Regions:
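Acidic/hydrophobic-patterned starts of short beta strands in beta-sheet-rich repeat architectures
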Residues: 8-18, 67-77, 130-139, 193-202, ...
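Repeat-based blade/solenoid architectures
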Residues: 19, 43-61, 107-125, 174-188, ...
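Gly/Ser/Thr/Pro-enriched helix-cap/hinge segments flanking short amphipathic alpha-helices
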Residues: 136, 158-159, 164-166, 272-284, ...
């Protein structure tokens, strides 16, 4: 499933990939409070082509590939193939001449033989050049030397968008991502880059890839150095988040019947590395499909949802809250997922979006593969009084800025960051919105960073809470922000460019640390003090400075130990909306 504005009316619709039936476009009818399929079986409908009844679609994504301000829609088909070559090509639909048409079926693209005819899995969008025009990254499932990963973009020199001519080309080899593997999960965003889009692929029967952007449209795989190769496991759903609110992007993903991972990003000698902090409960193996991250109850802390498929027996979905802790790894607690447990569900995908505009996220789960089942729609009851903020950045062309990073600074809880989804979960793409739950806190300013490095900051007032903000791509004049206009919250100051930056309390005079713990260590948004204890090579003082402990040495291989929680987690009541029993044509 994927979320985008299909009909151009400003509201978001849900695309559903149909494997043994037509693709669907589900629009929320606010009067009837139900989802309605607008891709009807009527050739006069502008959405008729999207149905693509012949395709066995399993993945879908949407983004603006030609810079017209409207997102194109890519369906990944796997007809008659688990791996290698399929018998039916993927489809890339553009709204042209009042209706959706397949660009890959255009004569110019048939001559170029650019259509992907491989058995792929996930698809995602990446703006590798920072132009606001996206390419479609396809995680193909190779068979021997057949079926490398692909990256399809518009060939600007051969195209004439004003006349509807969009010539496509596969630039995977040029970009450095043409790899052969059992491609599975895929996610895009500024993972280890400041604002440029990196690509993480979790794979089956092979090591994961972490493609770092080189800033020139090419990528380098740094998974081994970063410690996220996980070569003996079989990845599925994956998502990005900043769980401990330290300004770095973390990675959470599920392995098929293997230990699930929550990789927290570290900074060791200015090198990006990750450590797995998954607790025993979170890492518990399951037949996992989609993994997504959201703040369902708007309390300011993130939840991780694992959607499982009933494979050789029941397998319930699971939900975990990951809460920031001062000077420590986040606390992870399992929640009661309520009616969304679905132990007999044949889960194949899941997305989050705000269907009814009330500021609370709905969870949609698709099913299929081994048995036909309806789509489920859930909402969370707790948190109705919590504040929230939704931010929608736009590209220079006015489309959704997939891959942009949004940071909301608050009065009490520090900065919260989100990445506008470019394709994630597993075979899915979330809504193009940065959704912030604030609890009782207030956001004071928001910053947006686009994949080309441009940014903008905006001061927020109390009246901006519980609202949706659209932020356009900035001109040079708009990019400059007066420092006096911005409020960053505790632990941060405004720099000369009008952006919030960490305050280094350790340089203050008089010193902030007491005499018995004189060593000051600056942290993101704060500091910590410890005793002046020296340690030998390979060891470092603990947080209190009272003992020497081994330095973090897990950078891949076996799972690091996690701290289990023995307390009973609070119940998170998930109730089915009135539209759970969908009547779809």
């Amino acid at each position: 499933m994927a979320v985008t504005d299909v009909d151009g009316d400003g509201d978001l619709e849900v695309l559903v990939a149909g494997y043994n039936g037509p693709n669907l476009v589900l629009k929320y009818d606010r009067n009837k409070k139900r989802l309605v399929n607008i891709a009807v079986d009527d050739r006069s409908s502008p959405y008729y082509a999207l149905r693509d009844r012949q395709g066995h679609a399993i993945g879908v994504t949407a983004c603006d590939i030609d810079g017209d301000g409207r997102e194109e829609i890519y369906f990944l088909n796997t007809n008659n193939a688990f791996s290698g070559r399929a018998t039916y090509a993927d489809k890339l639909f553009k709204f042209r001449g009042g209706r959706f048409e397949d660009l890959l079926g255009d004569e110019v693209n048939e001559q170029r033989d650019v259509a992907n005819r491989m058995a792929g899995r996930s698809v995602a969008c990446v703006d590798r050049q920072g132009t606001g025009r996206y390419g479609i990254y396809i995680a193909n499932y190779a068979s021997g030397n057949v079926g490398p990963h692909a990256l399809i973009e518009m060939d600007e020199a051969a195209s004439d968008p004003s006349r509807g001519v969009i010539a496509l080309t596969n630039v995977a080899e040029q970009a450095g991502v043409s790899k052969l593997t059992g491609g599975r999960g895929l996610v895009v965003g500024p993972i280890i880059s400041q604002s440029r889009s990196d690509i993480f692929c979790d794979n089956e029967y092979g090591a994961n890839f972490l493609f770092r952007s080189n800033g020139d449209g090419t990528f380098t795989d740094v998974a081994a150095q970063a410690g996220v190769e996980d070569p003996t496991q079989h990845g599925r759903g994956v998502a990005l988040a900043d769980f401990n609110r330290d300004g770095k992007t973390d990675i959470v993903y599920g392995n098929w019947n293997g230990p699930h991972r929550l990789f927290l990003q570290l900074s060791t000698n200015r090198r990006q590395r990750f450590k797995d902090i998954a607790t025993q409960k979170l890492s518990m193996p399951s037949p996992v499909r989609t993994v997504l991250v959201a703040d369902f109850d708007n309390d300011g802390e993130l939840e991780v949802f694992f959607n499982n498929i009933a494979y050789r027996g029941p397998s319930a979905n699971r939900l975990f809250r990951v809460s920031r802790r001062e000077h420590g790894d986040p606390q992870i607690e399992e929640l009661n997922v309520g009616e969304a447990t679905e132990p007999d569900g044949r889960g194949t995908g899941a997305i989050v979006t705000d269907l009814d505009g009330d500021g609370r996220l709905e969870l949609l789960i698709s099913h299929g593969e081994s048995a036909a089942q309806p789509i489920s729609v859930f909402r969370v009851n707790p948190g109705t009084s919590n504040r929230w903020l939704r931010v929608i950045p736009r590209t220079r062309f006015g489309a959704f800025a997939r891959g942009a990073k949004v940071i909301a600074y608050t009065k009490r809880s520090g900065p919260h960051s989100r990445i506008i989804d470019s394709g994630s979960g597993y075979l899915c793409e979330m809504e193009p919105v940065a959704h912030f739950g604030l609890g009782k806190d207030v956001a004071t300013s928001v910053e947006v960073f686009w994949p080309d490095g441009r940014s903008v900051a905006r001061r927020l007032e109390l009246g901006d809470m519980n609202s949706v903000l659209e932020i356009n791509y900035p001109t040079e004049e708009q990019e400059a922000t007066a420092a006096a206009e911005i409020e960053c919250g505790n632990g941060f100051i405004v720099n000369e460019n009008g952006r919030c930056t960490d305050r280094d309390e350790c340089t203050q005079f008089p010193p902030v640390c007491p005499r018995d713990r004189p060593v000051c260590i600056n942290t993101y948004g704060g500091y910590k003090c410890r005793a002046n204890k020296r340690c030998g090579q390979g060891f470092e003082p603990n947080d209190e400075g009272t003992a020497c402990v081994a330095q973090v040495a897990y950078f891949g291989g076996t799972r690091s130990s996690g701290r289990g929680l023995g307390t009973q987690a609070p119940r998170l009541c998930v109730a089915v909306l009135g539209l759970a029993a969908l009547q779809l044509p």
